[in-house]
């Protein structure tokens, strides 16, 4: 195989894609979506094939032989019959070979393309709960414009914000009381799609 760094093609794709965003939609958010997918193989002689755990399998077994790819996709706004529609453009894929974690692969891809978004004001990274960990959160803190939206694990411990200083001696509290997702959140009266929604600033460990 040629020893060529193909990651530069991610930058080229992102740069060309951003040119397609209409001028009157450039204030709309851009989404960088992170996910991973598995490709099963029936043979065992394929290069880098391995036994993988598939939590979404419906074949009676949660394991399969195949490859796992981490993907980064750009979703950008365009006009479609006078309505805003988001166009999905794949930026890059990395095969997970178990030498590096999927978090490391995802973080590296985001860092690779972020220079192309330096002039964008509203960049949002979307991912599921598996990626909401320090490796990826630290990338968000390295740049001025990105934000991150991700699912929290169902067993995540969440706390109220730290109380105001009391002036008493001793170390101030780092967080407030522990919160319950069942009783400490005010949800909307009506569903948004399939879900009730609510908002509250909290603290958690990731």
Roles of regions detected by a PLM:
Residues 1-2, 125:
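Major-groove recognition helix of helix-turn-helix-like DNA-binding domains
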Residues 2-85, 91-92, 195-206:
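Active-site-proximal, Lys/Arg-enriched surface segment
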Residues 94-206:
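An internal, acidic/charged active-site-proximal segment
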């Amino acid at each position: 195989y040629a020893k060529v760094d193909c990651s530069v093609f991610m930058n080229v794709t992102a740069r060309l894609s951003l040119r397609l965003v209409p001028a009157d939609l450039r204030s709309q958010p851009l989404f960088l979506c992170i996910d991973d997918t598995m490709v099963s193989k029936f043979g065992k002689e394929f290069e880098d094939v391995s036994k993988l755990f598939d939590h979404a399998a419906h074949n009676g077994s949660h394991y399969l032989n195949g490859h796992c790819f981490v993907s980064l996709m750009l979703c950008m706004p365009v006009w479609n019959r006078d309505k805003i529609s988001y166009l999905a453009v794949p930026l890059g894929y990395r095969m997970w070979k178990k030498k590096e974690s999927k978090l490391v692969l995802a973080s590296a891809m985001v860092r690779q393309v972020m220079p192309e978004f330096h002039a964008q004001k509203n960049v949002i990274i979307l991912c599921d709960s598996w990626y909401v960990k320090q490796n990826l959160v630290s990338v968000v803190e390295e740049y001025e414009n990105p934000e991150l939206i991700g699912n929290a694990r169902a067993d995540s411990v969440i706390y109220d914000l730290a109380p105001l200083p009391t002036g008493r001696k001793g170390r101030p509290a780092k967080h407030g009381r522990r919160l319950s997702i069942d009783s400490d959140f005010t949800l909307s009266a009506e569903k948004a799609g399939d879900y009730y929604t609510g908002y509250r600033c909290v603290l958690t460990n990731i």
